[in-house]
Amino acid sequence: MADDKKIIFSMVGVSKSFQNNKQVLKDIYLSFFYGAKIGIIGLNGSGKSTLMKIIAGLDKNYQGEVVFSPGYSVGYLAQEPHLDDTKTVKEVVMEGVQSVVDTLAEYEEINNKFGLPEYYEDPEKMDALFARQAELQDIIDATDAWNLDSKLERAMDALRCPPEDQPVKNLSGGERRRVALCRLLLQKPDILLLDEPTNHLDVESIDWLEQHLQQYEGTVIAVTHDRYFLDHVAGWILELDRGEGIPWKGNYSSWLEQKTKRMEMEEKTASKRRKTLERELEWVRMAPKARQAKGKARLNSYDKLLNEDVKEKEEKLEIFIPNGPRLGNKVIEAKHVAKAYGDKLLFDDLNFMLPPNGIVGVIGPNGAGKTTLFRLIMGLEKVDKGEFEVGETVKVAYVDQQHKDIDPNKTVYQVISGGNDLIRMGNRDVNARAYLSRFNFSGSDQEKLCGMLSGGERNRLHLAMALKEEGNVLLLDEPTNDIDVNTLRALEEGLEDFAGCAVVISHDRWFLDRICTHILAFEGNSEVFFFEGSYTEYEENKMKRMGNVEPKRVRYRKLMED
């Protein structure tokens, strides 16, 4: 429970600007209570990760003051965490309980000393060893350290960490994040800073993490685009909007309600301001020379109003998904498809039929075969048996997770345009800059080098590259990773307006609930279930089908016993 009388961290007038004089944080005043659960939201580039780095003590180049109450610890999960590549998964995870590991090591060292002549021949040294051994025994008993291995195994299983003996240097980006998160949760810092903690976690792991954080004694501050996570965990929302930090007491749904009302008020104010601007502009244009002095004063008034209008305007995000050729009734049908890698069977006798105008959400644990399914449909891999029947009118656009085809040394505009002002889309030519603007790349954003893009910007660019081909069937592999909540809404609206069929791999439950007409669920044990309805309806159906039998890992267990 949050203690609203114990402030453990404060920011006093904190501002942050980059070398290009862009101010991302402006005069932030905040105080965090012990035990509070805070979700940070805002557009990409609004300063969310910068704020986290300041709190973590990694960024000291700011104006203002940061005050920690003495005696409290801070732990930080970065988007790209640093791990020691010379260690194994278990060795890294054990760093989270280093004091326990050190206690066990010292206890073992003392036991070894009992057999050395320099100790057993010296009564004083033996007495000192016995005394220290007793102290360590009390610590070990109090922390249940003898069961450390089973506790670490439970922690790694909860977050789907790779095998404990796997070298860290061989891990993927997602695996590294899961290992780093496991290590951090075992440390139990008083202030837990999580930058996109749900990225690369499957739904079951996210459910487990939500329950763990709900019961977490310390303060949790999380940057995340997962709106269900914000609903279930956050008791406060901190919105970063045009440099300002706007706190709200409540979860995401309650914040969304007040945000809508606030935007309505801003629109009314903006409407009045626009009318005033129009009158001022008309007067300025018509003012005779005889009233030049007054004209200058009113021109200054006009400029002030214009600046306020620019300041108050919040950009409406839009992602445009062009419709491909008309899609017939036959889309893609899986018939008795099977696929295995060695002894690992991903699925056997897979059957489903994609709906012509549907949006199919693909869910399941990491490694279950979701991405493999897309690669099989695209012909990038071969089925072991069965087949995919593809309709004659189908034109597939595939957006994978890798983004390997983005040249980091080219600008956004160069990647999309190929050096041409017009790009060919179907039977028509489209202005390349206009096309990019439909994916929320403004004029200055279009000149950014791709190597400098954020994760969300790279996702939008990759989406624009794939959709340029005007497919009528979209295969989207984790398109919601690394993009902010506003961009997520724009993507949802773009998909809802899309006339073809979309198949989307995602762990974002809010996203799945809002747009999906069908769910293709990888349920474990090589079983795949095709369901017509939303994600929540699928979950209800799943509980009815399973009865009291819960799948492995659904039941919540504490990371470490107290």
Predicted regions and their residues:
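Intracellular alpha-helical coupling/juxtamembrane segments of multi-pass membrane proteins
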Residues: 258-291, 295-301, 305-312
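ABC ATP-binding cassette signature C-motif
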Residues: 1-271, 315, 322-562
